[in-house]
Each structure stands twice: as structure tokens, then as C-alpha cells.
């Protein structure tokens, strides 16, 4: 969105002439592809691998300097052309203007009073860059032959963007010319800036994003140079790493899912004008109207003339914002830290615990989240920890007898403990685990706060330090919360307080004709609030009834900018890992839906 550009926007119109030969770059990219396709490094070796990959990438960037396609002037010089183009093609352009909000970057400012829930912005399909428009473009022949482009719409969209940027007469030039020339995603971080993220929970995703992007570039460089269907692509003679990083970041920070024209499925899209809106806390207020075939956005709240118009991107953590959007949101009520937990197969009760978890729809090993808000754990994590800490007798109670299914229903409900002893154990475990994670950081909370007072820090360095500080603060709160809960349940146990009795009327159950197939609503989607679908995530802005009528892609946890659930992310990454093992042509865009 507008916030992504804090740097000078280079513009010129054509690529410069470089002396480096395609064969020389081909040799370097082959080396890069081999390095990026090697097995994952062992514990403690990720940084070393990152530096090695980065060294190769920088060598390629240096040799390609001057080859990239750029434009003349500043980004904002093209805003009038964008508004004119949008207006001529049926988009709304009244009631707002594009303005530089300094720290937040460019955004939309109201030029009149706008009421909450008022429809103020709409963008018809013809203005959107989509996977479908990519298929029908000069990229089409290569798309029809390359299985990576076919399988990963985000990569297809990135190449679509590159091809159109290199085509002076492209229909989308008025839009493309207003995109930032650089972003603040970790793909653009200097090595010293990435170093600030060492020991954080987010660093693994940063490494993965960088490695996957480098691997994709190396693979596609060879495709562009050797595939017969790539001969007519306008980027054939100037496909640089810098170009690919830019395209990937443009897509990563902006893409969303919209319905196809017949409404039968979804497709990825870039949405001009709308993608200038910056983020604030709130609710999803963007939808897709199939009847009018356009993206629509209603006001999140009342906006007076002269105020910035915000939208809600969704329930993203700050790690997701930094890695995928290139900014840190200071007042993020949805911030959280990933925590990997699993039942050891060496546990003598493993089989029983695995069965109880399976009945609750929870895997024996997964990535959960510790939340900034109270309570620090979700119903899914509570259920997992309860099973993790169960005795053999408690496990039997959840597996055998007429009341077993009822006990499964209560696993994620804090009002119905398995036992006081079980609660003491799980909160003790969580306290210890969060404490151990805190000790892995190389700096303290106080030291981070002190460093942030240094005005010489770059914007990206500040983001990195804020991110690691935020992680520590969440972990510290989790430790304190766990300690309070531990003592409360210990007191209940010492006083031999009676356990609350479960009654079916206490919980909402999913309707089903087969009793044993019912699952408690609270456990149905693992860590549902930890992330959301990679979709245009559009909640009905006015009413659910109208949403159904208009054919909007809805979802309470859906958000703009291509976020997805942690479970979905893990599943997709697993599939990608399998594909990567098959050969160099299997590649992915980590975090660039993503």
C-alpha cells in the first residue's frame, strides 16, 4: 500500500546497456539455483546459508547494474494520469486524493466528509491485473508451458507485471508508473539490518523468503533465456534480480483474491487506487460485487475532509506485516508470536494423546501462537496443552465411555478444566517454555528500547528492532499470565474446589446427523485467529444479505493483501518442499502469495 515506498522512485523508460553477457549470468544463476536447492541447513546454520546465498545474489546484482527498466520522474508525478485512467475506465475518483503522509508514506485523503459504511471507492475488473489477464497477455504462451507459472498465480502475476512494465503501450502503464520503485520488505534489507532479527521467531520466515525468491529468480532466468516461448517477452534481454525482487514485492504487498467472472472460483489480482489505502485496526470493509463486476470499499468509520482514509488489512501479526507488507504497526491488537509445540513420539502415552488430539481435530505437532492480548493462548492451544499434560487416567476418560465425546467438546473451553492438576501443569509448562524462548534473544527489552532512541537508525533497522522487541514483550506477558494462572489453579487444587460440571447446553456444537462426527466449534480450525485465508478477504460491508446477493468473497477472518492461515501456510510450504525435492523446476514464492 502507500506505506511501502519511503525511498526515491527511479523512473526512466528503458533499460541501460550492460556489458555482462547472458551466459555469464546464466552460470551464476545456475550456481545460485544449486545453492538454494540444497537441503535445509542444520540448527544454527541458517545464517551462514543466508550469507552465502546473499553473496551470490549481490554478485549478480552488481553485474546487472543498469539493466533494469525504470521510469522518469517521481512516483507522485504520475498520480494525475492514474486518476484520469481510472475515471475513464469506470472507477470512482471523487471524494479522495493521493497524498504523502510522511512516515506512513502515500495514502488516500478525504476531500469531503465520508460517513461510516458509505461506498466511496469502486474499481471495475477491467482495471485489475489478474492471473486471467496474464494468460491473455504476451506471457500467455510461456504460461501455457510452464507448470510453475500455472501452479503459482503469484509468480504469474509478478511476471505479468514485469512484462507490462517493459511495454510502453501497456494498458496498465498509468497504474504501474505509480508503484514504488523499492519496498521495505526484508528482501530489501541490508545484511546488517537483517542481523537485528537474529534469534527472533520471525527470522526463519525472513530466511525462507529470501532463499525462495533467489531460487525462483535463478530458475526463471534460465527459462527466459532458453525457452522458445520466452523469445517475444519484452523482458527477455533485461530480466534482472532487481526486477524480480521488485515484482515479487509489488505482488506480495498488494495482491488479493477476487472471484472469476463467473463466480465459480477465485483468482489473484492487483487493485489500482484501492491499494493506496493504509492500515488501521477495525473490520474488513472491502468486497467484490459480481453483479456490477467490481471491487467495492465502504468507509471503515467516519472520515472528515482532510483526514486519511484507512482500511483494515486483517488480523496480521507484526511479523507478517514486516515480512509481507514492509511496515510495522505500532498499535497492533492482533500481534502474536509463533510457538512450535509437539508431542514427542518417545512419550509412552503418545498413542493415546495423538488419538485424543485427532478427535479434537488437532495435529500432534503444529505451530501455535502466543497473543498480545489476554488470554495469551487460543482455545486450540489450550486444548493441545491440556492433552499434552494429561495423565494416563485422564486420557482414558477422553477416549472411553459415554462421556468421552462430551469431554472432547470441552477441551478448548477455559471454564471446564480437565483437572486442577492438569491446569497447573499446562500453565507451568507454558511459563517455562516462554521463559526459555525469552532467553534465546541476544538483547533485553530495555536494551532494545534504548537502541530505538538512536535517531541514526535506518527505517528498516527500526522495523527489525521493533519486531524483536514486540516478540519479547508478548513472551514476557505470556510468562506473567501463565504464572498468575498457575498460582490460581494451584490454590483451587489445594482447596479441593469442585470442578465445574459440563452441560451440553453450555457449548455450541456443530449440527451433524452422526453424533461421533461432531466437533466443537471452538476446535474446528486450528489457530484460526493466527492467520487468515489468502484472499481478497472481503467481509460484506453493508450486510450479509447483500454480500450473498452481490457474490462477494467473504470471511470474518479474511483480510486484504494475501494473508493466509498458519495451517494453510504450513501445508503449502510442505507441498513446496516436496516439489523442491523433485527438481529445480519446482519453486515457490515464500510469503508472496503470498
Curated annotation (Swiss-Prot):
Q: Could you tell me where this protein is found in the cell?
A: Cytoplasm; Nucleus
Instruction: List, alphabetically, the CDD domains matched.
Output: SET_SETD3
Amino acids binding S-adenosyl-L-methionine: 75, 104-106, 254, 275-279, 325-327
Segments passing through the bilayer: none
> Which Gene3D superfamilies does the UniProt record give?
Rubisco LSMT, substrate-binding domain (3.90.1420.10), set domain protein methyltransferase, domain 1 (3.90.1410.10)
Which ranges carry the SET domain? Answer: 94-314
Which terms under GO biological process does the entry name?
A: actin modification; peptidyl-histidine methylation; positive regulation of DNA-templated transcription; positive regulation of muscle cell differentiation; positive regulation of transcription by RNA polymerase II; regulation of uterine smooth muscle contraction
* Basic and acidic residues bias (residue ranges): 573-582
Write down the top EC class of this protein: transferase
Keywords from UniProt, A to Z, are: Actin-binding, Cytoplasm, Methyltransferase, Nucleus, Phosphoprotein, S-adenosyl-L-methionine, Transferase, Ubl conjugation
Q: What's in the GO CC field?
A: chromatin; cytoplasm; nucleoplasm
Q: Which residues carry this modification: Phosphoserine?
A: 513
Coiled-coil region list: none
Per the entry, what this protein does is:
Protein-histidine N-methyltransferase that specifically mediates 3-methylhistidine (tele-methylhistidine) methylation of actin at 'His-73'. Histidine methylation of actin is required for smooth muscle contraction of the laboring uterus during delivery. Does not have protein-lysine N-methyltransferase activity and probably only catalyzes histidine methylation of actin.
Q: How does it assemble?
A: Interacts with MYOD1.
Any miscellaneous information on file? Answer: Shows protein-methionine methyltransferase activity in vitro on an actin mutant with a Met instead of a His residue at position 73.
Please state what the annotation says regarding this protein's domains: The SET domain specifically recognizes and binds actin, suggesting that it does not accommodate substrates diverging from actin.
Q: Which family does it belong to?
A: Belongs to the class V-like SAM-binding methyltransferase superfamily. SETD3 actin-histidine methyltransferase family.
Q: What is this protein called?
A: Actin-histidine N-methyltransferase
Amino acid at each position: 500500500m502507500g506505506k511501502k515506498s519511503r525511498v526515491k522512485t527511479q523512473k526512466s523508460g528503458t533499460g541501460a546497456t550492460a556489458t555482462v553477457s547472458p551466459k555469464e549470468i546464466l552460470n551464476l544463476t545456475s550456481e545460485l539455483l544449486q545453492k538454494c536447492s540444497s537441503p535445509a541447513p542444520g540448527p544454527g546454520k541458517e545464517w551462514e546459508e543466508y550469507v552465502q546465498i546473499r553473496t551470490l545474489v549481490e554478485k549478480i546484482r552488481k553485474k546487472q547494474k543498469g539493466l533494469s527498466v525504470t521510469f522518469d520522474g517521481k512516483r507522485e508525478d504520475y498520480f494525475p494520469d492514474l486518476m484520469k485512467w481510472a475515471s475513464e475506465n469506470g472507477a470512482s475518483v471523487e471524494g479522495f486524493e493521493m497524498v504523502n503522509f510522511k512516515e506512513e508514506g502515500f495514502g488516500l485523503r478525504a476531500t469531503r466528509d465520508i460517513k461510516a459504511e458509505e461506498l466511496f471507492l469502486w474499481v471495475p475488473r477491467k482495471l485489475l491485473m489478474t492471473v486471467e489477464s496474464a494468460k491473455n497477455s504476451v506471457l500467455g504462451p510461456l504460461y501455457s508451458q510452464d507448470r510453475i507459472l500455472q501452479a503459482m498465480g503469484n509468480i504469474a502475476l509478478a511476471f505479468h507485471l514485469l512484462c507490462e512494465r517493459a511495454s510502453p503501450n501497456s494498458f496498465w502503464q498509468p497504474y504501474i508508473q505509480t508503484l514504488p520503485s523499492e519496498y521495505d520488505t526484508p528482501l530489501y534489507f541490508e545484511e546488517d539490518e537483517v542481523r537485528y532479527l537474529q534469534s527472533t521467531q520471525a527470522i526463519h520466515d525472513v530466511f525462507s523468503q529470501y532463499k525462495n525468491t533467489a531460487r525462483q529468480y535463478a530458475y526463471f532466468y534460465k527459462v527466459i533465456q532458453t525457452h522458445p516461448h520466452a523469445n517475444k517477452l519484452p523482458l527477455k534481454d533485461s530480466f534482472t534480480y532487481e526486477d524480480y525482487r521488485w515484482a515479487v514485492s509489488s505482488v506480495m504487498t498488494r495482491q488479493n483474491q477476487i472471484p472469476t467472472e463467473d463466480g465459480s472460483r477465485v483468482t489473484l489480482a492487483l487493485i489500482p487506487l484501492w491499494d493506496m489505502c493504509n492500515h488501521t485496526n477495525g473490520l474488513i470493509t472491502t468486497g467484490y460485487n459480481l453483479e456490477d463486476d467490481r471491487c467495492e470499499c465502504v468507509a471503515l468509520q467516519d472520515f472528515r475532509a482532510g483526514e486519511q482514509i484507512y482500511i483494515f488489512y486483517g488480523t496480521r501479526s507484526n511479523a507478517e506485516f514486516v515480512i509481507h507488507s514492509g511496515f510495522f504497526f505500532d498499535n497492533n491488537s492482533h500481534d502474536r508470536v509463533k510457538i512450535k509445540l509437539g508431542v514427542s513420539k518417545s512419550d509412552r502415552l503418545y498413542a493415546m494423546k495423538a488419538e485424543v488430539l485427532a478427535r479434537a481435530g488437532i495435529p500432534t505437532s503444529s505451530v501455535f501462537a502466543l497473543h498480545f492480548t489476554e488470554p495469551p493462548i487460543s482455545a486450540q492451544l489450550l486444548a493441545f496443552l491440556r492433552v499434552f499434560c494429561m495423565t494416563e487416567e485422564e486420557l482414558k476418560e477422553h477416549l472411553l465411555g459415554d462421556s468421552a465425546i462430551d469431554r472432547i467438546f470441552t477441551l478448548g473451553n477455559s471454564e471446564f478444566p480437565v483437572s486442577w492438576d492438569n491446569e497447573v501443569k499446562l500453565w507451568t509448562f507454558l511459563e517455562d517454555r516462554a521463559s526459555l524462548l525469552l532467553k534465546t534473544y541476544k538483547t533485553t527489552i530495555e536494551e532494545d528500547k534504548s537502541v530505538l532512541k538512536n535517531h541514526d537508525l535506518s527505517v528498516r533497522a527500526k522495523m527489525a528492532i521493533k519486531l524483536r522487541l514486540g516478540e519479547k514483550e508478548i513472551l514476557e506477558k505470556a510468562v506473567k499470565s501463565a504464572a498468575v494462572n498457575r498460582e490460581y489453579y494451584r490454590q483451587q487444587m489445594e482447596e479441593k474446589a469442585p470442578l465445574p460440571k459440563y452441560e451440553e447446553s453450555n457449548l455450541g456444537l456443530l449440527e451433524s446427523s452422526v453424533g461421533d462426527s461432531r466437533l466443537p466449534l471452538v476446535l474446528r480450525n486450528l489457530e484460526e485467529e493466527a492467520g487468515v485465508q489468502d484472499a481478497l478477504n472481503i467481509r460484506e460491508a453493508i450486510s450479509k444479505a447483500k454480500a450473498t446477493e452481490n457474490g462477494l468473497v467473504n470471511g470474518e477472518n479474511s483480510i486484504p493483501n494475501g494473508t493466509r492461515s498458519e495451517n494453510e501456510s504450513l501445508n503449502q510450504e510442505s507441498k513446496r518442499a516436496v516439489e523442491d525435492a523433485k527438481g529445480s523446476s519446482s519453486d515457490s514464492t515464500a510469503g508472496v502469495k503470498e
